[in-house]
Amino acid sequence: YVPIDEEGEAASKTLEYAFDDWTIARMAQAMGKGDIAATFDKRAANWRNAFDKDTGFMRARKRDGSFRTPFDPSASGYGTDYTEGNAWQYSWYVPQDVAGLAAAHGGSDKLLARLDEVFNAKVDPSIFEHMEDITGLIGWYAHGNEPSHHVAYLYSYAGQPWRTQARLKQIMDTQYADRPDGLAGNDDVGQMSAWYVFTALGFYPVAPGSGEYILGRPFLPKTAMRLPNGKTCLLYTSDAADEEDS
C-alpha cells in the first residue's frame, strides 16, 4: 500500500495501483508469461490493505500499518487521503474483484445495503464547494467525477440487476441533457460521454482489460455497431424508454 505519511492521496492510489497491476497481469497472461501474471495478480489484491473491516470503508494507512485518524468518510480535499473524492466515493473501486469486495463487507446482502446508503444519503452539495471536481451528486454518488462511474452496476454483481437498471435510468435522466451544461462534470478523456454511450447500448466494461461487459438496460430501440471484422452487430430492444424496470 501507499503510506499516507509519505505520500498524499494514498488511499485512492493504493486502490488504483491494485487495478493497474491486475491489468498488467491480464496482459502478461495473454502473452503466455504466467510467472509475471502471478506476480501482478498477487499485487492486485493490495486493495485489501486499504479496507477497514470495522468501518467498511477504504482508508489510508501509515507506514506503521495503522489507519490514519481521525477519520471522516465525508471529508474531501486536494492532496488528502483520496484524489478528488472521499471514502464514500472511493470505497467501491475494486472493479477487478467485486466478489472479493462483497465478501469483505460480509456478503452480497451487506454490499447491497452499503450501496443503498451511497445513493439514498441526504447530502448537501455545498460541502463540496471547495472541490469543483465533485459534481452530479445522487446521495454520495458523484457522477461528475469518474471514479464513481461503475458503482451503479455493482447491484448486478450482488444479484439484483433490476436495481442496477433503476439506478442507470435515474442517472441518465438527471445527469445528461442536450444543452450547453448537459454534462454533470468534465469529460475527462471522454469518460462522461463513454459512460453514456455504453449505458445507452445496454452494457458496460466495469473492469476494463477483462474483455467482459456487465449487462444494464438499453436506452435505444435499435443500435448498429460496425465491428473491425467488417460485420455489423445489431441490437434491438422493446420498451426501452420509460417502462417500469423489472
Q: What role is predicted for each listed range?
A:
Residues Y1-F219, T223-K231:
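Active-site core of glycosidic bond-cleaving carbohydrate-active enzymes
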